[in-house]
Amino acid sequence: MKTNSLLRRGAFAAAVLVAAPLVAADLSEVADLKPLAMKVYGIRSVERKGDKTLAVTLGASSSAGARRLVNAWRVTSPDDPAYAYSKFVKPDSVAEVSSEVEFKYPDGMAEQKKVMPSLSRTVVELKLPTPMKKNCQYAAVAYGAEMEVVTSGRTGLYAGEDAVAADLAAAIVGLRRVSSVGEGKLLCEFGAGYSPAGGNSAANWKVTVNGKPRPVLALGRRSKIDCYVPKGWGGTYPCLMQHDVFLDIGDTLKKGDKVSVEVTAAVTAGARDASFAFDESKCVSRSIQANQVGYLPDAPKFAYVGCWFGSFPDAKFAGGAGARKCANTKLAVSSLAFDANPSFEIVDEKSGKPVKKGTAKFVFSGNEKESKKASYAASNVWELDFSDVRTPGRYFIRIPGVGRSLAFHIDKAVYEKALKVQALGVYEQRCGIALDPKLTRGWERIACHAGGVTASTCARVKNPEFAPFDKHVVNGADGKPLVLAASGGHHDAGDYNPRSHLDVAQALLNCYELKPDAFADGQFAVPERGNGIPDIVDEALWQLKLWKGLQDEDGGIRAGTESLRDPGFFQTVELDDTGDYAWAKDSKMSFQCAGAFAQAARILKKCGKAAEAKDFLSRAQRAYEWGKANPTPGLKDGQDKEYNSDPRAYAAVSLYHTTRDAKYHDDFKAISPWASNPKAEVSSWGKYDLSLAARQYLLLPKELADATLRKTIEEAMFAEFRMFKSGSAKWPYKFLRNPWAPITWGTGAYENYAVTAAHLYALTGDKECREWLVRTCDNTLGANPLGLSWITGLGERTIRCPLHNSRYRAAGGPVIGLQAQGPMQRGHGYSFKETLYPAWKEGEAVLHAFIDNHWAIAMDEPTVNNMANTLLVFGVLSK
């Protein structure tokens, strides 16, 4: 191979052979480069060599140890039974045929190279156990072994399909593309080959507009991890970086301007030039952030314009004349700044004609902080209000001198699409069942944890997560460990941990009762379609199936399931050796299940499933009585309400709703604080949490509820909503959050703090609740500082690398419907802080603290209970 043989020749080019044009010019029209980067850094190609060999080419995200191991690979075929997925076929042997440095880092990167792998290209050959058939497809899938993964890039590919060309590899490693930011600023996107030292010299840059040179006045940079080469568990990983470099070239671009950027070999390995023709109707700018799925016709519609330039103007940049000064001196120079509030247009994509013209509203200066302790957006921000555009259609936002947004819909069905994708994500988390590739859009998975659950005496109150279950098993009459006939539920997160989540069922059942007309049988991709039960209820029942199996004859219910430890993130299901154990019975989960079982009973009765309804109600009543008779012992301060009175209040009101027996209503009133203290909050941190009970009470038919008590609880929930609204009311990017909750583990991406507003809106029609639900969904679906949709499959520019075992398949990446945790305020581990530029500081640019790669677990791992809450919110907004 001739390294860099496809780089263009230009004024700054080295004397290398020239072949086809570099694809970087074409990349200017790609909505999201992340999938291409994963292809370049992971499996690039798979080729058949005879009938028993597959040659696999790997990019720079490749572990030298793992890629040579037989146990790290699988070979699968959709049409050759000998290589069926369920057989988990391994190669007989793996041989490394070649490994060479494909791109050499520029000089002056000694410090960066300490954490960066070489930019290598490797070929391994997999020798197969049986011959491949002539007319069948075969895929190589890279897993991992011995605590190393083969790659963090693309993990699977069919032979002869979608191979990466050398010019694409050069573009992804080097200068990927150039785009408009606005007001004379350009964004140059670089891959791992970029040298900060080389980029900090103006002499190494050549920028032209319409063939005329433009000086680079100032430069800023944001750098973070693009892809890992994981070895071991946690710690510091070798990593491949991505760099957003912002150039100030002075004058604002006009339609038709042809922009070209070239750099010397001192700036980057790989591709060194890129160009584009500026047109506000065609050039997507990352400065404009909107909901990528769309907006309801009669709902508020907001988008934003703003862009943080990182270190701009970087003091290390030599040779520039200095950044152009903005007329508005109150604005931060480190982000996009307009002399006056910019105009914008909402454009019908089909006709190309504007349907609205407006002026953006200035809402925030990047010189300010959203709170006393933290800066979140870190940029100047303008808000675009186009709420008066109501005609259904597909639109985009256009701003002179900046560019356009990604397209979005205005339609009454936008949340139905979001709902179905999120429902698919929850289905993909099912445990104890084989997943049908016809339903998952191609992901096949055998049934897991279907052999029953081993009973233990471990109390969950003493071990909130893992416990030494294998040392505390319950033996049956035969003296052997007692295995309960329990299966079902949903996996906790991205691996095969069977940690049970009753709250999935609680969210889905509540969603159905809040808006029953929005749900039907046959609506979602679930195997129970056609059984006469709405699909959202079927999904909830799959969760309850597990808890039914955990109920003893005396009515008590074990406190859930857990494994000995987290499974390996690159293990296939059949290799999971962490076990499936049940906690001891306790009052908390007995009461919680009583409430959920009672709710399922009344829903199933309305669906004409009398026998199933009767069984659930009997189980609910027995669980409730057991919980009352067996309060959890050994509780510490503050735990009594968590384990006894709080869940009992929830169970009591749900049983009252189902049975109409006043004794349960009396129990609820005796337990809840509102009879004696009408000002009591729904929950108080560390003291009590009556959220489940309060929501259940509002679901009561009016003739069953105590009118005064219901109004009191409703007011308490509105007070909680107003508190969550205050969490970002003064922020430029608005979404519901607890003002005391840091941006961590989903706070900046999930809908968890929107659940209260969802109940209130569905039951009262409150317009303010609806507006904040919509704005929270906007944040999830792209209207955030990063311009990312946090859910795979919803939008054109989304997260691509959630930590999820569906990435180990022939498609080479995760399924749709998975929601990432999002920004992590303290940049938890995984080399994030060590590699970030500008250097990480507590409380700065918090909403930018995100890496889109599987191994940044606190940022990228989906969790099923949170996805169920998102489904609930989408459901309330649908139809």
Describe the function of each predicted region.
Residues 1-12:
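Bacterial N-terminal signal peptides that target proteins for export
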Residues 15-23:
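Hydrophobic h-region of N-terminal signal peptides that target proteins for export
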Residues 26-74, 79, 141-143, 154-206, ...:
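N-terminal non-catalytic regions of secreted/periplasmic and cell-surface proteins
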Residues 30-33, 63-111, 193-228, 316-350:
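Short, surface-exposed alpha-helix to beta-strand junction/turn motifs within ectodomains of secreted
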Residues 32, 159-163, 279-300, 404-443:
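Low-complexity, Pro/Ser/Thr- and charge-rich linker/hinge segments at domain boundaries
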Residues 52-79, 124-153, 185-208, 225-233, ...:
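Extracytoplasmic/surface-exposed domains of secreted proteins
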Residues 173-179, 186, 194-202, 225-240, ...:
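Aromatic (Trp/Tyr) and acidic
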Residues 528-532, 536:
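Acidic, glycine-anchored loop motifs typical of Ca2+
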